[in-house]
Amino acid sequence: MGPKQRVRKDNYWDSGEADKDREEAEKLHKKGQQQSDSDSDSDDIPISKKKPTSKFAPVDESSSESEESSSEEEVQKKPSKPAAKQSKKVAPTNNKKKPVVESSSSEEEESESESEESSEEDTKKKPSKPAAKQSKKVAPTNNNNNKKKPVVESSSEESESESEESSSEEDTKKKPSKPAAKQNKKAPAKKAAAVESSSESEEESSSSEEEEKPTKPTQNNNNKKNNAKKPPAAKPSAAKQQAKKPAPKKPEEPEVLSGFLLKQRQEEERIAREKEEKRIREEEEKKRAAEQKIIDDEKARLKSIENSKKRAEKKEKQAGAAAEADRMAKLAKLGVNISAVGEKKEKSTNKTKSGGKKQNQVSSITESVEKLKIEEPTSAPKDDVVEVMDSWDNDDYETVEEIQKKKEEEAKRKEEEEEAQRLAAKEEKKKAKAAAAAAAAALIPTTDPTTTFADKSYRSPIICILGHVDTGKTSLLDKIRNTNVQGGEARGITQQIGASFIPVDAIKEQTKSFAEKIKMDFKLPGLLLIDTPGHESFNNLRSRGSGLCDLAILVIDIMHGLQAQTLESINLLRMRKTPFIVALNKVDRIYDWKPCVNTDFKEAYKIQSKSAAQEFDYKVKDIIAALAGQELNAELYWRNKDHRKYVSLVPTSANTGEGISDLMLVVIQLMQKLMLDKVEFTNQLQCTLLEVKVIEGFGTTIDVVLVNGTLNEGDKIVVSGFNGPIETSIRSLLTPPPLRESRVKSQFINHKSIRAAMGIKIVAPGLEKAVPGTSLHVVGPNDDIEKIRAEAKREVDSVLNDVETSGIGVSVQASTLGSLEAFLNFLKKIKIPVANVAIGPVHKKHIMNASIMLDKDPKYAILLAFDVKIEESAIQAANEMKVQVLSDETIYLFEEKLKKHFGAIKEKLRAETASICVWPCILEVTNVFRNSNPILVGVRVKEGTLRIGTPICVPESNCADVGKVIGIKLNEKDVTLAKKDDVVSVAIDDNNTKTTIYRHFDDKKQWMSKITRESLDALKEGWSEDLTKQDIQLLKFMKTVYKIQ
């Protein structure tokens, strides 16, 4: 509860009593001044002040002045300690009022706390003479008219501010001296005023306690007057002291406030205590964790030491055994006879005499080896092992039983190793005699000045060129072939059968300026570029499970980006896992591009305008983003730091020759850095058949690519045929003349022997039935011809047997074995069944095989001819038998043709079966509007779909026919069908039925669509793709209702 407010009376100030009180206050003020002057003059006379009779307390201005002077003296001198506190005077109240305590309880508490603090400081400071503190006087109330009067407070705001300023000045210089006692303010003898003052003092006391360094309250009257000069004031009489004693009163409100502060402090202490305990617990946990970690680390260290010890011992023994076995194996290969492990060899006494003839290289090597002393493999003594184990026992980590067990295991392992070593030595001794002659012959170097290191060690890599139609593949090949042709000379570039061979000398001349900058070292003899169509040269040809091409060049038109066949080529490259680079062709088509004929691209890029360079950068970024969409990382070749993870982009122009040298150099670099071991030359034959052609003057020939090995004239070969393996002998090995004469068919160069890699035309009898895309085998003198024939047959059968034929499907014809395999994968992807497959041109018999589908499934009576020739007899047979033949040279175009073909067949079939097929539905009759001619009813579709033309019957009424639906209305609108849960009005034609509603059937039973076996078959053939799972389930249920088999 707040303090009670004093009721203000306006008539007091208008009356004459206010003037009288003002005059009396002025008189008292003058008396106070005179008295203060007299006090200052008389030092030994005590101050005696009369009690004012007026009901107003005088305003003592001298107190503030004396207070200011005393504060100034306190700054200079040590503060003197105050004496005992005088009691406060209580003013008598009216007859009906009880006496009011002048000082508030908060002021008493403050004065008591101040007195306690001052007593503590007395022990530190020297005490001075105390000065008596005057108490404030209480003005008596007016008894004349028995009314409450307003009171003028004795202390002014000016004195308080002055005292605060003096105290702040004192704090800056020295420690503040605490006053002995605080004088109480004079208050009127009114209950409301007393309560108000007490509440104010409570707020002041609470605010002062919350501060970190509480400031002491200001003094209202003269606390100290010239402490050094003025003697202490005289004590008042006993009567006055008795009168000044305050009436006892229990301060209830301050005690409640003190209890609240106490609880708040206790709560803060509890929180702080809990935080401290939590911190201590966390530190203990961290300490325990650290100790546990130290223990675990020590255990791990001991264990690692033990393991490292074991590994070191094991490695040392294995290394010793391996070194000994290797040394003995080398000696055995050199022809040294080793009797047994551990036996000493006798030193050879054979020495060359000075001046004698030198022995051959083999005998000298054998003699030098025999002079060597073969050391016996000695094992470590057991005493050393025991000593090592004893040293580990000092760690107190292993028990005696464990050490003993390890010793036994070690001894057992040594015995096993020694036994294995003896067996290996015996085996090496057996092989030594057989290998001695060959090893000795191998040590004799054979030098041939006509062969180079590159020709001897490596073959030419086979490069395939892929890309979309009209991206410049053929132009790029022509530019590569004709780059160094000057003055009508080919400069070593020869045109091979189905391939273009670029020798290393031509590549060096073409990339001369570029290769010198990077100090290129050419190790390959050249490049073999396959110029057959991409899908033939790459996807189809198989050579012992790997693709024909070592590296592919994917040509992309920089103006158009990735196109349909480009994506197909990327998929083929991924399927074969063949590395490739990208040639960004037609850079000369960029706007404002300045052509630089036969220049490396980086030099041509430097002279371009800013707009042309920016457009080139934009095009490159678009292609990189498109390749990223195909999950390929790509970058321009001079910025590519990792060729294994990023595809190199080489800008080129087949028209001006820009970037051609860059392309050749990037191919060489990629092959030499990453795939040099793949193009290493071996004597094992690897040859793939490309095409079967009839050449005038030679008959039937085959074009092959010799990947590895050597072919000789007269070799016996085996190739795969349509009717089985073909055995024949090579009559001629032909290559075309230089490039300028390549178009003359009658001129070929005949070779006795050709080494890989090369494109060759082989002339041999009986090659008419050879299968392109298969391997060519050479039969050696010690080879099993039956095994080779089985392998050739298995190569064709593996593809033909992989065809998943269900007896119903299309017929497929392809040019090569590989193209057939690729085409079958494509048809499987688009879910087209295959019934028959064949390789080679389309004949009449193939049309007859396809016509079988006319009886089984007419929509599959088609033949797909992929890149093959169609004979005239086959075309006539197809027209007569109504078999459609679809032919094309690219795979992706077949998808559009097949969609168009099956779409036309489907529309035709639907038109034929529309009047027969019946869709399943179950109806619930809600209203009958008309009984006949026609029947008009309201129905709800419970299951299926209701369509116009659907026959309706009632199965529960002996399958009574209702009629055929001729109209459906939904929300007053005509519709062609009603779906499940639709409520519609239906018009049913009953003219052709012999039943009547409510006589043969009623509306209380379910009505259904009437299905038959013919309607089910027609629905499956023409509308199977439109049937839902719910429709199929409903048809199964209705088959049981109508008992259809």
Swiss-Prot record:
Residues 467-474 are annotated as: G1. Residues 458-675 form the tr-type G domain. GO terms for molecular function: GTP binding; GTPase activity; metal ion binding; translation initiation factor activity. Binds 1 monovalent cation per monomer in the active site. Structural cofactor that stabilizes the GTP-bound 'on' state. May also act as a transition state stabilizer of the hydrolysis reaction. It is an enzyme of class 3 (hydrolase). It is found in: Cytoplasm. Residues 62-73, 105-120, 155-169, 199-212 have a biased composition (Acidic residues). Residues 1-325, 339-384 are annotated as: Disordered. It catalyses: GTP + H2O = GDP + phosphate + H(+). Pfam families: GTP_EFTU, GTP_EFTU_D4, IF-2. Its cofactor is a monovalent cation. NCBIfam families: PRK04004.1 (NF003078), small_GTP (TIGR00231). Plays a role in translation initiation. Translational GTPase that catalyzes the joining of the 40S and 60S subunits to form the 80S initiation complex with the initiator methionine-tRNA in the P-site base paired to the start codon. GTP binding and hydrolysis induces conformational changes in the enzyme that renders it active for productive interactions with the ribosome. The release of the enzyme after formation of the initiation complex is a prerequisite to form elongation-competent ribosomes. Belongs to the TRAFAC class translation factor GTPase superfamily. Classic translation factor GTPase family. IF-2 subfamily. PANTHER family: EUKARYOTIC TRANSLATION INITIATION FACTOR 5B (PTHR43381:SF4), TRANSLATION INITIATION FACTOR IF-2-RELATED (PTHR43381). This is Eukaryotic translation initiation factor 5B. It comes from Dictyostelium discoideum. The gene is eif5b.
